[in-house]
Amino acid sequence: MDKKTVVIINTNTMTLDMLNSLCAQMLPDVRLVNIVDDSLLPEARENGITPAILSKMSMYVQCAEKSNADIIINQCSSVGEAVDILRKMITVPYMKIDEPMAEKAVEIGGNIAVIGTVSSTLEPSCRLIEKTAEKLGKEVKVKPVLLDGVVDLLSTQEGKKKHDEIVCNEVYKQAEDNDVVVLAQASMHRIKEKLKITKVPVLSSPETAFEAVKKILG
């Protein structure tokens, strides 16, 4: 039997190894293909979703469709809102990596803390949760928590330790007053294994996305 193909459109190489490894664990019978364009994130951080971003991403999703992808995942939440436009152009399912996480957070409900280390990701992540709650008829209170600039620590080995320490401490803090803690960026999944027991669920987008892909592909 031919393997199902999952295509991930990435805006950086930072999460490639983690996503490849997690996919191999959770979806061992799937063929994973990565498309990487590291010009997308700087543009989105500076100017939001621009025509240039839409043009490039349109090309990538159409290439993925022509390559017989069974599902396409958008890895970066900073350009996630482009998916709402581009998914109308193709017939293949096109998922924002944080959509399943948003649904799970809303199902848990109540007070939702969303921790991010990039403002261009945090804002659309919060909007996605609010829109998901509206669609599902749920009332939630979303609290954005920006750890500004912390993502830049991931560029060095010593910085990675500091990044993980800062994010973990913030998770513990937000777990005191909220019903669920959401990690806004795929790059933050790395801290899950470092967390000690928390009072509430802590959700990461790669894990919930691959769980959703498994259900979709059957």
Functional labels for PLM-detected ranges:
Residues 1-218:
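Non-catalytic structural scaffold of enzyme domains
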